[in-house]
Regions:
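Short, glycine/acidic-rich hinge or "gate" loops at secondary-structure transitions
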Residues: 3-19
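Sequence/fold signature of self-assembling virion shell proteins
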Residues: 17-50, 82-184
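Ordered core of a single globular domain
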Residues: 49-88
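Short, charged N-terminal helix-start/capping segments
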Residues: 1-3, 97
Length: 184
């Protein structure tokens, strides 16, 4: 449930049953959002620094330096960046700081030009979103007869040792100021 919700938050499409429009869908539809053209062939360890740099260079001067500015990146972008940090992408035989290899120790904080990179597993490959956290919203209805979570013990029904989970809920996302967001 958590992974499906994560995927829908970032990449959902209202036309798909059980989904709502995710940030990628709403940001693409907003003409005010700053769009950065993706590199042909996708992001990899050899070009990731330039691609994240293109995203950072497109951030509005009103937002750059904001306390809650973050760059949300897909799994392949984070993986490529971590690999590039160790020097392995440059083929110079680099082994990272103190020969410790790549730089993402125990899943700690990763930054680019001082801006936190946040792994967003729900983003599709080669996607990045630079935005203030306060400009991105997630909402759900909790006090309604349309909201329900149930665990059904199937032992009394069919004699099995199974449980079934029923979940019904509503959710959605929204952004406020499109011109303060960069979509790669």
């Amino acid at each position: 449930v958590a992974q499906k919700t994560e995927n829908t938050i970032w990449s959902g499409t209202n036309a798909n049953e059980g989904e709502f429009d995710g940030f990628t869908t709403t940001l693409l539809a907003d003409a005010d959002v700053v769009d950065v053209a993706a590199v042909g062939g996708g992001v990899n360890a050899a070009n990731v620094v330039a691609q994240i740099g293109a995203t950072v260079d497109s951030i509005s001067q009103n937002v750059y330096g904001a306390e809650d500015l973050q760059i949300f990146v897909s799994s392949n972008v984070m993986r490529a960046y971590v690999r590039a940090l160790g020097g392995f992408a440059t083929n110079i035989g680099g082994a990272g700081t103190d020969n410790k290899g790549t730089q993402w120790y125990s899943g700690g904080a990763v930054t680019f030009d001082g801006i936190p990179l946040v792994l967003a597993p729900g983003l599709t490959a080669n996607k990045m979103v630079a935005a203030e956290k306060s400009n991105l919203f997630f909402g759900t209805g909790l006090l309604s007869d349309q909201q329900e979570v149930k665990v059904l013990d199937m032992a009394d029904i069919d004699g099995s040792q199974n449980v079934r989970i029923v979940m019904r809920y509503t959710a959605g996302i929204q952004h406020a100021i499109g011109s303060d967001i960069v979509l790669y």
